[in-house]
A protein has these predicted regions:
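C-terminal motif of bacterial Sec signal peptides marking the signal peptidase cleavage site
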Residues: 16-19
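Bacterial signal peptide processing site
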Residues: 21-25
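Short solvent-exposed coil/turn linkers within tandem alpha-helical repeat scaffolds
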Residues: 29, 64-71, 99-110
Length: 111
């Protein structure tokens, strides 16, 4: 009797664990967005005071389009968003990273 119970419990556990793989993974809706759309959405989040979401979108923009026209701007915006979110340490780190990556950029003096 105990052997049958053990087999039933083991089979139930296996079925339960195998079912976890059937659930769809969370998809990133921004994965197929253009650089322009990512930038516009991030700026919109900044305008509405949603700095954490803006930072996430700017980081996604920078990682998806590292050599695009918005990459350097996204880095500057990340620093500004951290500053606006009262996170001075992260803002300073973002500024230092920008200066290290773009020492001759026209906006370095304003960082």
């Amino acid at each position: 009797m105990q052997k049958k119970l053990l087999v039933v419990v083991a089979m139930s556990a296996l079925l339960g664990l195998s079912g976890c793989g059937l659930l769809p993974d969370k998809t990133d809706e921004t994965a197929k967005w253009s650089a322009e759309k990512l930038y516009a959405e991030a700026r919109g989040e900044m305008s509405s005071g949603q700095y954490a979401q803006a930072i996430t979108l700017f980081q996604r923009l920078e990682s998806n389009y590292p050599f695009g026209t918005y990459a350097a701007q996204a880095q500057m915006e990340i620093a500004y968003a951290h500053y606006k979110a009262q996170d001075q340490a992260q803002a300073l780190a973002a500024v230092e990273r920008f200066i290290k990556l773009h020492p001759n950029h026209e906006a370095v003096d304003y960082m």
